[in-house]
């Protein structure tokens, strides 16, 4: 999982990527291609 300062490009890497807020952090999850998972500080 990458830790990025901005998730704008991370959500556009794959069309299945979606942004989720969990416990005050912002995550990008991608079920079809999990290598695109990322988290914002």
Swiss-Prot record:
PANTHER family, per the entry: 50S RIBOSOMAL PROTEIN L36 2, LARGE RIBOSOMAL SUBUNIT PROTEIN BL36B
Domain of life: Bacteria
HAMAP family referenced in this protein's UniProt entry, alphabetically: Ribosomal_bL36
A single GO cellular-component term on record: ribosome
Cross-referenced Pfam families: Ribosomal_L36
UniProt keyword annotations, A-Z: Ribonucleoprotein, Ribosomal protein
GO BP terms in the entry: translation
Descriptive protein name: Large ribosomal subunit protein bL36
Entry annotated with the keyword Mitochondrion: no
Family: Belongs to the bacterial ribosomal protein bL36 family.
């Amino acid at each position: 999982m990458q830790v990025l300062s901005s998730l704008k490009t991370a959500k556009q890497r794959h069309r299945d990527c979606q942004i989720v807020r969990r416990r005050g952090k912002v995550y990008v999850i991608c079920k079809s291609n999990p290598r695109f998972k990322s988290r914002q500080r």
